[in-house]
């Protein structure tokens, strides 16, 4: 998730409840292949050893640039490469990137081929949706399988549906049937709220795994079912917030507005008397020093 799953966030999750695999934020393949864009985008590909195994995620519509980015991922030491064919944002799809590639299956296959060519043997996955304006799960997944990705991660909504309707897990199940026949790993995504629900969905629909997005954003302990976030003390949550702010500042410095960090405040500052008032004060902060002063007082 853009402006969420950076290295700072992933290190927090790794501390609380590491998943089986981490994915980076999606990064523009075109930007990484431009002299001006690469320096600005490289922090999005930063990671620490405690985030392994970790997969680099790219978006774009230029096969040659995916080849180059795959080579870059190998050079940086990533454990896998993911091609984003699922982002529904208008500014992405209008350039045939993200979910826009669902409308152009031949280009999508060419991108997969070029990514694999540059990947040096690293596994290559595709993250996508069940359709663009309408559901075309079986037709679309069949096209992708022809390019022989190592895995397909499928979100159970169309581009048009965004996140406005419940995920169509029956369609994810249809994709799973096709992938199993082809020997392609299949991972489902959409509306997973608990660890137990994820395991249940994987079993019910014959999946190799599930990917969690928004569920882990609100609960850093998501991948450790033995931990109930409600039992965490204010002191524990505040300590975790301080660590997150420190990591965020070390990673981004002045290259990303501090307001991006503020979306996490409710995750840590909630569940006790006075938390709302403290959170409102924290929302006025402009940097880690402001946060430190408020948390000390």
Where on the chain are the PLM-derived regions?
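Alpha/beta enzyme core
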Residues: 11-16, 67-81, 85-95, 106-186
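Short glycine-enriched, charge-decorated loop/helix-capping segments at active-site entrances
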Residues: 96-102, 161, 227-230
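Conserved phosphate-coordination/catalytic loops
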Residues: 60, 102, 106, 166, ...
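Glycine-rich, positively charged N-terminal anion/phosphate-binding segment
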Residues: 3-72
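Alpha/beta catalytic cores of nucleotide-metabolism and tRNA/nucleoside-modifying enzymes
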Residues: 2, 8, 110-113, 137-151, ...
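Active-site beta-loop-alpha junctions enriched in small/polar residues
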Residues: 1, 27-29, 59-61, 86-88, ...
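Conserved beta-strand positions in the central sheet of alpha/beta enzyme cores
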Residues: 22-23, 55-57, 82, 153, ...
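An active-site metal/cofactor-coordinating segment within enzyme catalytic domains
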Residues: 37-38, 43-47, 90-101
